[in-house]
Amino acid sequence: MSGNKSALSVVVAGGGTAGHIEPALAVADAVKAAQPDTRITALGTARGLETTLVPARGYTLELIPPVPLPRKPTMDLVKLPTRILASVRKTREVLDSVDADVIVGFGGYVALPAYLAARGGVLRRRRKIPIVIHEANASAGIANKIGARLATRVLAAVPGSGVKNRGDQDAEIVGIPVRASIANFDRAGLRSQAREYFGLPQDGPVLLVFGGSQGAKSLNDAVSGAAEELAKAGISVLHAHGPKNSLEVTQYSETAPYVAVPYLSRMDLAYAAADATICRSGAMTVAEVSAVGLPAVYVPLPHGNGEQELNAKPVVAAGGAIIVSDNELTPTFVAGTVVPMLSDSARLDKMSSGAANVGHRTAATEIARIVLDIAAKENAVQENARGNR
């Protein structure tokens, strides 16, 4: 781009999974709210969820070749340098075309190429672009660990995530950015509307069950298997079983229904309708559930590097949740542990306060402030450079 710039240009890099995309979009929204004329560009891949999520939020999506970083030595590791070079080359073109003032990276398949295109060694551009990194998980991925060493500011959701800046200092703790509808959430105020929306009774406890965008069979089996015990205790259930799964549950009570749906498009109303939830403990899920002060039973994914359990531990320590392993989540556990929990309003109130104390509702706004400050300084440097030509 040539000539004078009319607005700051912010590039967000966090494609691949919802756990990377949603924080990026939350920050993008906060940036636009603070400075509406800012130009936002999102980097993504053709196979990621960003192909639908980013345009739906009104932002420009630029596709680059993905660079999945293998956790174990495989043939993919041999192909990695070639893939990185191709992706960095394409990313450079995007950064040049939008005249980026700052890159905000959230990890994932597009983050490493963005970091290297901005500052990376022999791959360095004609000018450096400031980098802000945010690590949402309790255990950082490879891309953000590398990028943190190149970044202007390094931010994280929780202490001890493994991302350190160039001075080997730990990241600044800001929490996980959540969308405005969650940050400004009034669970009690929306309760009546939410329950009517889902066909749930206005009175009595409600258990929310969801296993991510695709559902989770272990959660489905355990909770549906305890349907009779839940109904006898007067507990209604709102259960998102996943679009690829089916769930047939006997209705044991007219006053405490079991509402099973493939997918929840209105998670804000689902949170408002519920008194507690059983769910996975991905970083974004924990952030949202904590931000709205919803007591939780977290069931970490049984595979991976254990980061989901780490994500939930601060909430458990604050008294806002309990953790159960995937193989221990059974109908017997639901009947023996979850039913008594939902039947104890004093305990739920205490757990709600504990969860809310851990939640960071202002993270997106705080990160946006940091990003805009860095972008403005870079923009001024570039304007001065143009004026001296």
Swiss-Prot record:
GO molecular function, one term: undecaprenyldiphospho-muramoylpentapeptide beta-N-acetylglucosaminyltransferase activity
Membrane among keywords: yes
GO biological process: carbohydrate metabolic process; cell division; cell wall organization; lipid glycosylation; peptidoglycan biosynthetic process; regulation of cell shape
EC number(s) per entry: 2.4.1.227
Highest rank taxon of the organism: Bacteria
Pathway connected to this protein: Cell wall biogenesis; peptidoglycan biosynthesis
Key words of the record: Cell cycle, Cell division, Cell membrane, Cell shape, Cell wall biogenesis/degradation, Glycosyltransferase, Membrane, Peptidoglycan synthesis, Transferase
UniProt membrane topology term: Peripheral membrane protein
Subcellular location as annotated: Cell membrane
CDD domains: GT28_MurG (cd03785)
Catalytic activity: di-trans,octa-cis-undecaprenyl diphospho-N-acetyl-alpha-D-muramoyl-L-alanyl-D-glutamyl-meso-2,6-diaminopimeloyl-D-alanyl-D-alanine + UDP-N-acetyl-alpha-D-glucosamine = di-trans,octa-cis-undecaprenyl diphospho-[N-acetyl-alpha-D-glucosaminyl-(1->4)]-N-acetyl-alpha-D-muramoyl-L-alanyl-D-glutamyl-meso-2,6-diaminopimeloyl-D-alanyl-D-alanine + UDP + H(+)
UniProt binding sites for UDP-N-acetyl-alpha-D-glucosamine: 17-19, 137, 179, 213, 308
KW Membrane (keyword) present: yes
UniProt GO cellular component terms: plasma membrane
Primary location class: membrane
Function, as annotated: Cell wall formation. Catalyzes the transfer of a GlcNAc subunit on undecaprenyl-pyrophosphoryl-MurNAc-pentapeptide (lipid intermediate I) to form undecaprenyl-pyrophosphoryl-MurNAc-(pentapeptide)GlcNAc (lipid intermediate II).
Family: Belongs to the glycosyltransferase 28 family. MurG subfamily.
HAMAP family per UniProt: MurG (MF_00033)
Protein name from the UniProt record: UDP-N-acetylglucosamine--N-acetylmuramyl-(pentapeptide) pyrophosphoryl-undecaprenol N-acetylglucosamine transferase
Organism: Rhodococcus erythropolis (strain PR4 / NBRC 100887)
